[in-house]
Amino acid sequence: MDPSQIGKGNWKGFSIPLADVFEAASEWRDSLAGVDRPWLCWNVSDRWCTLQQRLIQEVGWTPVIGYDPRCGPPKTVLPGSVVIDFNAHFGLEIMWPHFPLEFAFLFSDRLAFWHADLLCRMETMHKLKDVFEGLQDGAMAAVPDLGSRRHIYRLRHHRYWELAGCTTRGASKSQFDQGAGWWRFFDHHPNCPNEKERRRRAKYYYDSGVGIMYWKRRLGGQVVNIPRQWVDEGHCTSISKKNYRQVQPGGQRNLSAEIDLNFDVTEVAKQLGISHLL
């Protein structure tokens, strides 16, 4: 497997001893001591990350900033925000927020999260806040992704999307213990209970979040659906931009190099009514 896949959250070929992850997570937990409402954001562009920090703080949560090694730590860290180098123990060439998200139970009682390319109206931020703060331990919230119309009945392709959401320690621990969490190829999870179950899971789509849908549908997990229409408007992604430009056309996406190439954060903020936070 391409080594870069490990940092994206991929159980197939995952080679890092779990003991090493647990040790690293103890440091992440120490970094969040006294933080009741952490909200994970991922630095790929300083202006976008700064605006995300302000949005999070506006609703009374604490920005917890991780970052892709290709971009590095944020230049702007607002007072009260927390920066964590989730890659410090591993030295991976690429790291996505999926990596720490899979192990949320190790370092936080409750962890909100969203994409690095997502901005929201203040009205939406308050709706998300209310959902997140209303979660009981053992439950989580995320955006369901059932795919296009042709996939609506292909149940094994359905997944939950980490576009925006929140997990609790109990939910994250349940997913890890049962081997059905956020990462790709959840059939390769070390806690998959037996070979028969592994064969069952191998029939499912490989992508991230399929394990979360499986956890809900087959393992009794509690997931509160976040309506996609809440967040579609401010999701600045290649999916919604026909003339999206890649740094390496046809190659691996590099959001840190492409987000400012394709979207003007000032214009997006204006459209969402949050220019006052720039």
Describe these PLM feature segments.
Residues 51-63:
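Short, acidic, metal-binding catalytic loop of nucleotide-sugar glycosyltransferases
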Residues 121, 125-203:
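Conserved catalytic core of nucleotide-sugar-dependent glycosyltransferases
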Residues 1-50:
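N-proximal low-complexity "stem/linker" segments adjacent to membrane-targeting elements
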